[in-house]
Amino acid sequence: LLALLLVACGFQLRGSQPLPFSSLYIATGEGSELGAALRRNIRALGSTQLPATPQEAQAIFTVIGEAREKSILSLSGAGRVREFQLRYRFAYRVHDLKGREFVPPTEIVLVRDISFSDEQVLAKEYEEGLLYRDMQNDMVQQVMRRLAAAKIEG
């Protein structure tokens, strides 16, 4: 019944939106996991080409910075670490060779908290890796949504 009501009112899940660029050069370092994930997502859309050089592209995606940070969030009464805060920062811009900005310099910061135990060091290191991978996937999805919302004039 609920599904029928949702369909009747015109509700539909948000699908992947095509990017406004006919071609986009992704300027990331060699071996960048985030760059590879962005390329995979853009190829999956099928509407935007990924040329080998910036001269062939309508727009250029430039990474300004990418960093993983880890800081102590809380200590036990004995002075041992109980929680860490993980941060994943990513800054980028989208422009063309003439200097026009399609997406101005933008920084996205994702934060996750992780508990810590001296007795489970290996398990917590593995969990930390999973959290960073999860943050990277979230980052790719946020960047894709922001790219889809970019405005191109003329």
Model regions and ranges:
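Short acidic low-complexity segments
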Residues: 47-59
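C-terminal/domain-edge helix-coil "capping" segments
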Residues: 122-154
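Sec-dependent bacterial lipoprotein signal peptides
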Residues: 1-7
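Sec/Tat-exported extracytoplasmic proteins
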Residues: 42, 46, 67, 94, ...
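A structural "domain/chain start" motif
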Residues: 7-47, 152-154
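Soluble non-cytosolic domains of exported or imported proteins
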Residues: 29-36, 81, 85, 125-138
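Surface-exposed short loop/turn segments
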Residues: 62-107, 114-129
